């Protein structure tokens, strides 16, 4: 398995937008499935924002698009939110864990941040396992706090400090 992580480029955005139109990919995300053009415009705006504290990367296996991962700036000093979405064709192969390892290294070594936070719905067992395997600690659970398509989900909040 040869994964590469590259900073987001404009030509990557259609692949991300296609992935985020998939119902299965977005099932446990707090957004989506998205309209292709809305997603494309959202990522283009992020790419063009030179003052952004967000770091977005595409994930590829050889030349195949696997997904995207990011560290998103937060209001808390020296703290980033970890995010990753993988195309469902690549689930269950350990790529989410590898994306997390990459982001943790980038956050602590390159950005010199002190803390990374993350969250997921409690039903998103894959993401929960990834966070735990990466060393994140569960710090809080909010019950039935997010309504997605009429279903109330519990949200798990995680933290990892250097």
Please give the residue ranges for each predicted region.
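Acyl-donor (CoA/ACP) binding surface of acyl/acetyltransferases
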Residues: 1-22, 59-162
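Phosphate/oxyanion-binding loops and surfaces in catalytic or ligand/nucleic-acid-binding neighborhoods
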Residues: 22-23, 49
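Conserved GNAT-fold acetyl-CoA-binding loop/helix
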Residues: 24-45
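A short, aromatic/hydrophobic, helix- or strand-capping loop or linear motif
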Residues: 28-33, 53-59
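Hydrophobic alpha-helical membrane context
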Residues: 34-36, 49, 156
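Residue-level signature of transmembrane alpha-helix interfaces in integral membrane proteins
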Residues: 38-43, 51, 110, 149-151
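A short helix-loop-beta-strand connector motif used in the catalytic cores of GNAT acetyltransferases and
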Residues: 44-58, 67
């Amino acid at each position: 398995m040869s994964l590469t992580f590259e900073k987001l480029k404009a030509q990557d955005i259609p692949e991300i937008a296609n992935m985020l139109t998939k119902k299965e990919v977005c099932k446990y995300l707090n957004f989506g499935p998205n309209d292709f053009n809305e997603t494309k415009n959202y990522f283009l705006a992020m790419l063009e924002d030179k003052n952004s504290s967000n770091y977005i990367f595409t994930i590829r296996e050889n030349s195949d698009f696997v997904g995207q991962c990011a560290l998103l700036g937060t209001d808390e000093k020296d703290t980033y939110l970890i995010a990753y979405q993988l195309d469902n064709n690549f689930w269950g192969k350990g790529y989410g864990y590898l994306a997390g390892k990459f982001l943790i290294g980038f956050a602590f070594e390159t950005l010199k941040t002190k803390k990374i936070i993350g969250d997921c719905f409690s039903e998103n067992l894959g993401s929960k396992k990834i966070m735990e395997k990466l060393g994140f600690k569960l710090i809080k659970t909010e019950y039935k706090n997010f309504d997605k398509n009429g279903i109330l989900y519990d949200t798990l909040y995680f933290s990892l400090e250097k």
